[in-house]
Amino acid sequence: LDETYVDGIILTASNTRKEQLRYNAYRDLFEFKVDGQARVLDPSTTIKKVNLGEETFVVEKYVTDKGIAKYGYFTLLDSGKANLFSKKSVKFTPGMKGRALDGGDQPAEYRRAPDEFYFKVNGSDLVEIRSVKSMIAAFPDKQEELSAFARKEKISPRNILK
């Protein structure tokens, strides 16, 4: 996300370290330098959280679009009985040779993709927020109450994430 390294704190199960860090959203890892050498911090269960400026990143298990379960870094937006997370991502677009009418080549580029939002209730699995209905379905004992509230307040997914 950022080319420059920023002061950050890595909290693991056994210790706390201050490092110059930056988050690589394309590869979903943190990069830091030790004696001028670049190192990486892959998401693993030993990492409790990483504070980078105003943001707190935590490691959570999730299922990718391809159905593969893996660990990744998520920005913690809100915590309590239910936790709200965002997943930052960057997409790579390969370069293309210009065609007759295009007028030139298209260079390869990395482009920031919209954040994906997730929630987790009482230690359950991470659930992606795709729509208000899917979020309400995750609370079977409060479904009617939440549906009525969403209708009354005219809640859209954008409102949930603000």
Region spans (language model):
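Extracellular/luminal recognition modules and glycoprotein regions
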Residues: 1-7
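Strongly charged, low-complexity linkers/loops
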Residues: 126-146
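Long, compositionally biased interface segments
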Residues: 139-162
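Aromatic-patch recognition
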Residues: 8, 13-132
